[in-house]
Amino acid sequence: MQSSLKPAGSGVLQLLVCFLLLYSRPSSCSDINAHDGQGQVGSEQLWTFQGLVASVFQYLQLLFHHIVPQGMFWTDDIAYELMTKKVEHLSRLHPQYPCRKEGKVVSPIATTGVRGKQEEKLRLLSPQKSPAVKVNRDRCFTTKVIPKATKQEVTHPSKGFFGPFPTVGLNLVAD
């Protein structure tokens, strides 16, 4: 019989972290050399630990902004508050993000596709005009707290993609 030294769910967590690291890497996966495992990118593109953590938390924040409105949310506020505090702390550490609104730190949304490239070209062509400010505001989003669900919604959630979890409405304590 073979014993496992890892907790039961650690494989999924390791896979998620690995995916996030590869997804947030500044170069593509093809830049990794199979012989020594080192990337072939210049030293100016290497991630610092805080930069890597910041990009992972920003990706998670963006992910949470997509899943929370669909009815998936934390039953306790501890995990949400911890993630929000960490993202705000990292935003203060990395002031290169130009998006600030009414004293709140907001994170930029990465623009992709033709529209993002067109907006970037517009800013380069006419940096003195006001559309640059409009583009910056359009590229930012704020962290807002979604109101907690009523007790009835927690105990009897509406039919969704995953269906009700067996632990919904219960307070779980880790060993």
From Swiss-Prot:
Q: In which tissues is it expressed?
A: Pituitary, hypothalamus and pancreas. Found in alpha, beta and delta cells in the pancreatic islets.
Primary location recorded for the protein, binned into one broad class: endoplasmic reticulum
Pfam families the UniProt entry points to = RESP18
- Localization in the cell: Endoplasmic reticulum; Golgi apparatus; Cytoplasmic vesicle, Secretory vesicle lumen
GO CC list: endoplasmic reticulum; Golgi apparatus; perikaryon; rough endoplasmic reticulum lumen; secretory granule
Query: What does UniProt give as the signal peptide span?
Result: 1-29
Q: Taxonomically, which superkingdom?
A: Eukaryota
Identify the InterPro entries for this entry: RESP18, RESP18_dom
Record's keyword annotation contains 4Fe-4S:
no
Q: Does the keyword Nucleotide-binding apply?
A: no
BP term (GO), one:
in utero embryonic development
Keywords linked to the UniProt accession: Cytoplasmic vesicle, Endoplasmic reticulum, Golgi apparatus, Signal
Family listed? Belongs to the RESP18 family.
UniProt function note = May play an important regulatory role in corticotrophs.
Query: Which protein are we looking at?
Result: Regulated endocrine-specific protein 18
Q: What species is given as this protein's source?
A: Rattus norvegicus
Gene symbol of the encoding locus: Resp18
